[in-house]
Amino acid sequence: MTLGIFANCIFCLKVKYLPRQQKKKLQTDIKENGGKFSFLLNPQCTHVIVDSADVLSRCHLNSIQKNDVQIANPAFIQDSVRQRRLLDVRNYDPLSPAPAAPPAERSRSEVQSEYLPSDNTPEKENTEVTEVSAENVEIPPFLQDFEVVKYNILEKVGGPETVVVELQSSQDPESCPFVITAHFLLADQKTRRESTGKQTSEGAIEYYESYVEDLKRQGFLLQEHFTAEATQLASEKLQALLLEEVISSGALSQEVSDLLEVIWTEALGHLENTLLKPVNSMSLNDVSKAEGILLLVKTALKNGDSPGQLQKTMAEFYRLLPHRHPASEEVNLRLLAQKEDLCQLVRDMVNVCETNLSKPNPPSLAKYRALRCKIEHVDQNTEEFSRVRKEVLQNNRSEQPVDILQIFRVGRVNEATEFLSKLGNVRLLFHGSPVRNILGILSRGLLLPKVAEDRGVQRTDVGNLGSGIYFSDSLSTSIKYAHAGETDGSRLLVVCDVALGKCVNLFKKDFSLTEAPPGYDSVHGVSETTSVPTDFQDDEFVVYKTNQVKMKYIVKFCTPGDQIKEFHPHENTEVEEQRAEPSSVPEAGDFQLPDIKPFTNIKAGLQDASANPVPLDSVHIKGRVIDFVAQVIVFQTYTNQSHVPIEAKYIFPLDDKAAVCGFEAFINGKHIVGEIKEKEEARQEYREAVSQGHGAYLMDQDTPDVFTVSVGNLPPRAKVLIKITYITELSIQSPVAIFFIPGTVAPWQQDKALNENLQDTVETIRIKEIGAEQSFSLAMSIEMPYMIEFISSDTHELRQKSTDCKAVVSTVEGSSLDSGGFSLHIGLRDAYLPRMWVEKHPEKESEACMLVFQPELADVLPDLRGKNEVIICLDCSSSMEGVTFTQAKQVALYALSLLGEEQKVNIMQFGTGYKELFSYPKCITDSKMATEFIMSAAPSMGNTDFWKVLRYLSLLYPSEGFRNILLISDGHLQSESLTLQLVKRNIQHTRVFTCAVGSTANRHILRTLSQCGAGVFEYFNSKSKHSWKKQIEAQMTRIRSPSCHSVSVKWQQLSRDAPEPLQAPAWVPSLFHNDRLLVYGFIPHCTQATLQAFIQEKEFCTMVSTTELQKTTGTMIHKLAARALIRDYEDGILHDDETNHEMKKNIMKSLIIELSKENSLITQFTSFVAVEKRDVNEIPFANVPNISELVAKEDVDFLPYVSWQEKQPEASISQTEIDSSRLKHNKLSDGHGVLQPVSVSSEVNEKPSLLLAAKKRKIKTIKKCSLDISEDFEDRTAVAQSPATAQSLNFHLPLSVRPQLKAVEQQLHGNRLEPKQRGGFRKLLMAKKCRNVPDSLVSSAPAVTAEFSYLSACSSSSAFLSPLCDIPSSLPPHPLGGTHPPPPLPLPDGTHLPSPLFGSTHPPPPLFGGTLIPPPSSLFGGTHLPPPPPLPGGTHIPPPPPIPGGTLIPPSSSLFGGTHLPPPPLLSAGTHIPPPPLLSAGTHLPPPPLLPAGTHIPPPPPITGSTHPPPPSSLFGGTHLPPPPPLPGGTHIPPPPPIPGGTLIPSPSSLFGGTHLPPPPLLPAGTHIPPPPPITGSTHPPPPSSLFGGTHLPPPPPAGTQFSLSPIGFIPPKLGPPKLSHSHKLVGDTNIHDSEPPLLGFKDLCSRDMGFSCGTAFSGSFASSKDFDPGKFSQGPNNISFSPKAPEMGVLHQSPFCSPPKPPSAPPLVTNVLCSEAPQSYFLNLQSAAVHQSPNNRVSEIIMESVESSLPSDYSSRDASSYLALEGAEDSLLGGSSFETDTDEAAAFIANDLLTSIETSSDEECAFCDEDQESPVPWASLFALQTENGFWKLTPELGLILNLNVNALLTSLEEKGIRSLGTKGRERLLDLIATLLVLQFLYTKLEQEGMVAKSLIKMDDAFISRNIPWAFENIKKAREWARKTEGQYPSICQRLELGKDWESATKQLLGIQPQANTSLHRILYYSQG
């Protein structure tokens, strides 16, 4: 192998001034000869090739000298290659000036001279002209690949000098972007060229303008036309552009004139002989539709449709293009090819006629100019004629001679500019075509065939190489296509330059080709020879791009068989006179757009044809809003005041987003329902019904915003109710959705609809509904995917009620609907988050999807408003003449008025050419010039060559920001494909917004332009001018905002065989800031879709999904999806090619009609029709429709359990707020976080003084983080000693949470406690969670805090409900609140001390270790309470059902040792003790022993099974209630039946009844009691510790006393249930109707609110977490069971024994788990009824003293019974499903004053909390509940640890539809929620210890392993399980309204970051059990 001459040589190329092509040749020469090259100088280089010495820096020279590198100029390479040897570099010294290298000082402004004088010295003036640039830009001598942007020719006055100035835009990315060149022709016929480069288009234009102005100052003048000498100065690219100049200015020879007349006559004559209508009266839109029909027939022909079906489809083609003799021949490919050629010919003729104002036979010169093609005759005596003739004839392979008659040189402008000559391999080839087609070919060039195999069907090799442009190199082949003309008998051949580029030879046919194979530019079908067999008879060359073709000649020839005729056209070669311009330019005021609201001068009400008012009786509207869509039902009632039957027409106005989907009428007791039928069928049925005397109703949609209802034969004096249902989309303004109902009709729509006569039988009275003012009502439901921020109306006063995501609004009484309509504004949170809705059809297997996408672009993209350009392009072509051009000016002027002074603007008029206001966009400070430029425009600029404007602007692309083109046109563009190519090519910097004007506008091409150009299309319909301003404003707003374009949707389809998704819109338009996209689709079993879009040329992708949970059932989205498909059919883009678009429309027509019928939607093809059969003997208006009843049937109130939010006076309570039948609360924020109550109980209204006092009472507030407590408790409580003051103090508004600290300070106005004290008080008061206290749910029960225990059974919730509790209402000063020392501690022997704190003669509660211990007598009441009233219907309380598990509970004597049990010893510090023994009735209970610091008291066990409510005294606990009558038959309640499992429950007498028990002994310090045995399954009862959750005492000996149970607390033996009214049922009472729900008593309130004390431990549990099914707890009150699942729960608060060992460095974590409340299961039977709940109902864990202290002294049992009765009534109303009972109302007013008693014990509480702060987290209990797989179950045990109301959460999830996930899906989701809650709980605790982590799933493993290594693997396993499972439920958190994501949801559930007015806030804060 021979080595190259440059082997082992590495050349460093430093050729700065060498042209690009020479640089490439240099590189190629080096590589082909074995060398290598580099652009960097390195030690490996052997040679440096430089073209000028100035390119080498000092550093380069040092390196060259150091490494001994040889230097040479480029000639060294060229000569070495030529001589095939490596030459000596010394002969190519680069230091000597190279001939091609310019001087160094001219690197900025280059001057090149050709034929300069001998001294080579340029003239001084020319040098000065060029020294303008200041940019450091390398400028090549000549741009090789460029386009000419601007050019001018100037001649010097008085001298022969000429200069051509060009602004060139480089197409080479490596070259200078813009170059300004000036080519001078000097006086001595020598030339000189100057060039300057610029980097930006703005700089280039400014320099160009400045350069031309400088030439003018030097004496040069601008010239309009190029002379022959000046043309030689132009660049090759400019000479191609000058073809346009030659066409416009050149004279027309006789030969060219004759040719034009021949091809014109041939084309026009063919059309006249074929078509029935003249071509100038045809619409291009009809041509496009006809082409679509042909494509549809072609497809049907391929599919084998029957001939009858084909003929039926072709009939539509003949309707669009009427023929003189419709073809009756068989439909085949040949016929279709002929008709396609006919359509193209019609299109060509219409376009040509546009230039000549549609004149049928313009003069020859006008025809010539209309073709826009240069045609020159080539004389036969020239060398060019001989050369072309020879090339044509030499390839004639047939034996038939051909006679060349004439040759014409042709050239088209866009072919010259777009021709891809750089592909190479340019050959002269032939294309034959019939003479009638030559007119179109010259006008628009050769086009790709629409159907390749339709070309020349007579040939055997039709479409052999697919869909391309076919050429041949043989005349004999082209003759087959070049048919002789009928005018003169000659044939025409098109000779073209074809850039074949890299051509592939094929020997087999390939019909599927639509482009050249990869790597090739063209295809050559090789003809068959004897040696090479192929499929081709002739050589065929095929290209697939029109810009590979450039026409050069038209050859006129004939064959021996042709008969040449003499043709003498009419001599008319002169151009017609130009139209006279208008004498005066119209003023801008003449083009003002009408106002947006044109209804101000229209009368309101109904009117007949004589304008007599016919008042509308009433208008009622019911609506349903879901997300951004709505369904509205309108009831219109009116009466025929005439004495004769009439046909009335009713005009129903709507916006263009609406679609009617239902029409009904009620008249004379009849209900007529409209049916959708095809329009003609409906009208025929209507006419027949009217003629037969029947009633008939017809509803049409003539325009998008007007529906007409024709009511035929309306009887005299008849009242008619018309019910119209429609669907619509809401408009969007930022995050606000706007729903609007118009109150008037567009006047320009009324006349046409009213004047149309449908029947001739009865009188027609035309009615215009202009807005009914007499009677109007509206009610709407609103459902949003995210939180509703606000709801308001600027037209009407509303009342409303709402939850987070749902609301109901209605107008107030007395509202009216005037011409302003009705407007509703809905503020949304997170409106920018995409979402997906799926709806199942209730009656068939169908699913409709809706995607909502509203990108928040303003926050993502920078504001480029000041950098953007706006170019207003006004179409001034001839087709715009008339009213269309007036409308275009109106649009342009209004758009101009909306542009600010800081906006860069330019205005361009275009037709065949273009004119611009400025040479480049400028800021307009004065719009006068711009306005005059628009006003002076006239539709006389010829064709619509918008591509020239696009090309010009694309060459001058903006350096920064966007260019926004606003195109105002009728859309009849020339060169559509080229125009679209230019738009797509420049999308990165240019956006195209299109405005269609005129009734015949080509909306498809304009819509496609905007779609491809990242803009938006608007059609300005002359029938809806009232919306024009809004449309223009919308376009200008989009122009100023960032955009998101090329949006596409990909639907997830599980089956590969699934049909193509039916989506609307098929082509998604571009989106802008605040734009909202709704995409509909009929896609079965689809739960996921992907949205893709481009923002600033970066692709973004987002996925939206839903689950079975989110799928709804109904027809609303189905109707919306059908409506969207119909709209897309009418106005959308089904395909970018117009022919295919029309074909798809024809295919979809039947589908559209079917969708219309199925969904009752009016379309352009269908109408509503209803016929009312009438009998001549029927009595007129015998049954007047009951309007109110019909309206009431449409109930949209889906929040019946929420009351209306209404304003009320400050100091009084109105009657409307007191409703005894339904007592509910909904709160309105006052702006400061305080929730104000709206309504109160009617029972409370019986004591107005209490309510007024409550109203005036200041609301106490609680701050979560800090709380200032006043110390003037003495002053505040001293006043309460009197009954009057006690009454006023104890009844005030409910306690609410206010976050402002100053409000607390102002109300309490006391000295601040120390921070530590405040913190302790906060924890005591808030139970470590600050909760809102809604008034409707605050319990009036005695309070127990999570950190406060009583040393008695009263420490349990049930004990608090005891009727024996005796705590007075008045409270003394706090014992530790003042300056005096605390009282002495109680003695161990039980010595009594005075206790004013508890208001009795018994000793005060002992205080030890921060624990208040009230005396048992004060807690249990001793003998102070009278017996309860007897039970109605019997003397015995029915026994409760058995407890599951089979355990028998012995009597209290056996349980607690009877009266012989000695008192327990005193406990030392840290010891947990059980409650004292409970004795039988009659025993006096002494004060309990003292507890050491830190002692925790357990609560009693939760017991279920009783079916009786407590007595009133147990509900309100006071000792001042009158005694109820005794129970008949004795004082003892009969024993209950055995509890399931055999357990006997002790009687309350044994629990609470004793009075003489001596104080129990104190246990020594450190004493521990062994744990009790489990309950379930045992034959013995559990010890007290197991029931009360305290310390572990040994089980006591059995005894015999029994006791009864109640679902709401213990019922003492001497007390029966309260007497209730006959309408309420006692639980378990068989004498009352079973249908009524169980009664919830006051215990329900306590159990929700208070929970257990700090010492509570949950000893019982479910058998396993798997056995726990929250859904089972809503079955009834008697199905709760307990089992000893986790014994560690019994010692939950013995943290030293529970917590695992930890490293010494890690201190124990502080947690609120130690303050756990009552087990959830204890109250599940009560709380399970809470199906519905008020949005803000959540009760704070507050400290409450006894009920008695909250009630006035004169509060009677009647009041308590009233509350019970109300509660029962409420439960009856709501089916026992609501917590918003009247007892809640009562509790709201009772509980608030309990803060007084809270304040009196702050010091002790603070001391207690200080102790509690050191309590560690019960880690062992928490991780004991974790499953093997790592997750937790959502059980009450877990809820107890997390301080979470599990049942409330489960109830809410059930309401949200969690069961739709299925059993497994539901359980798995509950496990996920539980696990995430635990992880959030751990995350928060670890974060307090200093851990830093991103999220609850991404914790710091290192930190966890250091601090709690024993739990590291458990936490890791949980995180991995949660991460995997979370992905299976995308967006489920939002669907269930839990929050934005799991992070925020879990924080809210745990109270870490509570948020008011959220779903979770209301779910969990109403009941913390």
UniProtKB/Swiss-Prot annotation:
Keywords: Cytoplasm, Glycosyltransferase, Methylation, NAD, Nucleotidyltransferase, Nucleus, Phosphoprotein, Ribonucleoprotein, Transferase. InterPro entries: BRCT_dom, BRCT_dom_sf, PARP4, Poly(ADP-ribose)pol_cat_dom, Poly(ADP-ribose)pol_reg_dom, Poly(ADP-ribose)pol_reg_dom_sf, VIT, VWF_A. Residues 869-1039 form the VWFA domain. Residues 362-566 form the PARP catalytic domain. Residues 1372-1387, 1402-1417, 1425-1444, 1485-1513, 1521-1540, 1557-1585 have a biased composition (Pro residues). GO terms for biological process: inflammatory response; protein modification process. The modification Phosphoserine is found at S1229. Disruption phenotype: No visible phenotype. Mice are viable and fertile for up to five generations, with no apparent changes in telomerase activity or telomere length. Disulfide bonds: none annotated. Residues 600-728 form the VIT domain. It catalyses: L-aspartyl-[protein] + NAD(+) = 4-O-(ADP-D-ribosyl)-L-aspartyl-[protein] + nicotinamide; L-glutamyl-[protein] + NAD(+) = 5-O-(ADP-D-ribosyl)-L-glutamyl-[protein] + nicotinamide. Its main location: cytoplasm. Residues 1-94 form the BRCT domain. Residues 92-132, 1372-1608 are annotated as: Disordered. Residues 1541-1556 have a biased composition (Low complexity). Gene3D superfamilies: 3.90.228.10, BRCT domain (3.40.50.10190), von Willebrand factor, type A domain (3.40.50.410). One of its GO terms (cellular component) is spindle. SMART domains: BRCT, VIT, VWA. Its EC number is 2.4.2.-. The keyword Phosphoprotein applies. Belongs to the ARTD/PARP family. Component of the vault ribonucleoprotein particle, at least composed of MVP, PARP4 and one or more vault RNAs (vRNAs). Interacts with TEP1. Mono-ADP-ribosyltransferase that mediates mono-ADP-ribosylation of target proteins. This is Protein mono-ADP-ribosyltransferase PARP4. The gene is Parp4.
